[in-house]
């Protein structure tokens, strides 16, 4: 009977970990969610970098609001 309580507590821990997973399946989707575009290399004006896409060779760039 004790094993059931242990398994139930492990199940709750696993479910809490799954609930904390990000919704986005890839960095490209996360970049699009921020209204950004993936550009190879550094961001150029009027864009600025907010992150990276994939392997880090591409930058997630967002257009500057004041340009």
Curated annotation (Swiss-Prot):
Disulfide feature: 31-60, 38-53, 43-61
Which BP terms does GO give this entry?
Answer: cell chemotaxis; defense response to bacterium
User: Could you tell me the superkingdom of the organism this chain comes from?
Assistant: Eukaryota
Write out the entry's keywords from A to Z: Antibiotic, Antimicrobial, Defensin, Disulfide bond, Secreted, Signal
Name a Pfam family for this protein.
Answer: Defensin_beta
Question: Which is an annotated GO molecular function term of this record?
Answer: chemoattractant activity
Propeptide, chain numbering: 20-25
Identify the GO cellular component terms for this protein. Answer: extracellular space
Compartments annotated for it: namely: Secreted; Cytoplasmic granule
- Predominant location of this chain? secreted
What are the boundaries of the signal sequence?
Answer: 1-19
The tissues in which it is expressed are: Expressed in bone marrow, testis, ovary, lung and trachea. Expressed in the ovarian stroma, but not in the ovarian follicles.
Q: Which family does it belong to?
A: Belongs to the beta-defensin family.
**What role is this protein assigned?**
Has bactericidal activity. Potent activity against S.typhimurium and S.entiriditis.
Q: Which PANTHER family match?
A: BETA-DEFENSIN, GALLINACIN-1-RELATED
Q: What protein name does the entry list?
A: Gallinacin-6
Q: Which organism is it from?
A: Gallus gallus
Gene name on record? Answer: GAL6
């Amino acid at each position: 009977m004790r094993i059931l309580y242990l398994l139930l507590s492990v199940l709750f821990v696993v479910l809490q970990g799954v609930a904390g997973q990000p919704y986005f399946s890839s960095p490209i989707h996360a970049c699009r969610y921020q209204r950004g575009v993936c550009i190879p290399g550094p961001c150029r004006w009027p864009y600025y970098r907010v992150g990276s896409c994939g392997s880090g060779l591409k930058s997630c760039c967002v257009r500057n609001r004041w340009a």
